[in-house]
Amino acid sequence: MNAVPLTLWDAFVQAAEAAPDRPALVFEEATVSFSALRKDAERIAQWLASARVGRGDVVAIQLPKRHVTYALWLACLRQGAIYVFLDPRNPPVRTASILKQLKPRVFLTVGDDENPFGETHRLDDSTAEGWLAALPAGGSSQPAPVHGLDPAYIMFTSGSTGEPKGAVIPQQGVLSLMAWVRRSIRPQGEARFSNINPLHFDNAVFDLYGGLLNGATLVPVETSDAANPLIWVKKLRAGRANVIFAVPTLFQTLQQLRLLSARSMPDARVFVFGGEGFPPAALKAFRAAFDDATRLVNVYGPTETSCICSSLEIDAAALAAAGEGFASLGRMHSGFDHLILDEDEMPVETGATGELWIGGANVGLGYVDNADETARRFRQNPTDTRFRSMWYRTGDLVREDRDGLLWFAGRVDNQVKVRGHRIELEEIDLALEALAGVTRAATVTRPGPDGPQLCAAYSASGPVSDETLRSHCMSRLPPYMRPERFLALDVLPQNANGKVNRKAVAALFRADN
């Protein structure tokens, strides 16, 4: 790819024109070339235009990983529309909450959910390809004239108020991410990126943009298959994926099954992981399982900063520096500014712990339909108020050493990571407290064989069975947010100011274990 793309659609067109016959998508049953994918995206873009979808309009996509899903995503980029991937496994009440915030002009779904704010189109495996084939050829209209600060997508994460919150990410942030991948990740020769990450999950941004829009082949693995390591390793081998991005929990599962090896994954050249800490002993075993030519890259970045803002190559020196602790988050990438501030929003000394604030072109535009949370998290640089400058308060506690390496030290709130998913524990508490009879709830994590487990303690006005609690959670929360254990208490432990003492609750679950 030669010229620097000005828009995300430009980037895809450059990739398609540079190698039209190169595989863009490799499924188990079929391969789709870049030229074919471009034609389909242009046909869908014409269909979107007929539905009055243009620059700045929202399109919600709740579909599995199919050829048509990727073409829809690209069609949104061509139209300048803001796309939003939704989890097909979401309970209806959660999907309804998200649609209420988005008010999409068009909603495409595999389920029974309805969009009261615009059109709803149902596309399942039996109808999707027929729908695509019936669309007329793409017209001669020009792509929408989008700009760097125009939103590209909205990504929903857990919210502490009980409702999910949608981070709005601009085109310029994603273009910057793509440039970093070209500089730092892309292997020599033909690049084939995995797409294990669910499309509604932050890490998929790396797969779609760092991979496909940079001209690499994408090897999708359906979310349901990602739960079965034997299946997804087989699919990655069949697709000859050589850049593989997943959360540490998935790689640890492969280790337990003795599948994380050069023999099982002979094409792998770069492993990328992030979203949660990689246990030190497991990371050392991972590094030892491959030769030095195979790269391991630890990445860090909140959803609100376009997926990735720092990284670290995991080699012998990185492991030695970490000792018995977690590896460093690496150094901040070019294009980012960062501050580490104390509780008074003043810079800390080198080596001291404080909250990480991130600035630069990759910072998002706020949260959709959520002015309060936007004002709380997206802030003016408190150390320099002369000029307007949007910074993101991560809530992550870090320290920076004299070499510029960042080290994670905890959270300032009750946000946790489970299998790479950001979870606000208060959202689970509020969901449980919505069940008749439950008077108070407190969710915590405890160590489990496959990473942190969610556990919920509660008080109730009468007996409530675990089965009732699980059924209630299934109706309100996505799978990754559902507690695995419940504990009934007469009164939840409290601290001096009357708030629930989560540390004491966590100790009860550790004792119960």
Segment roles from a protein language model:
Residues 4, 13, 21-52, 96, ...:
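Conserved AMP-binding/adenylate-forming core of the ANL superfamily
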Residues 7-9, 107-144, 174, 295-298, ...:
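AMP-dependent adenylate-forming
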Residues 30, 46-89, 195-198:
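Conserved AMP-binding/adenylate-forming
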Residues 33-36, 152-179:
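Conserved AMP-binding A3 loop
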Residues 63-66, 87, 187, 197-204, ...:
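Conserved AMP-binding
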Residues 165-192, 202-242:
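Conserved AMP-binding/adenylation subdomain of ANL enzymes
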Residues 213-216, 241-245, 255-324, 337:
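Gly/Ser/Thr-rich phosphate-binding loop
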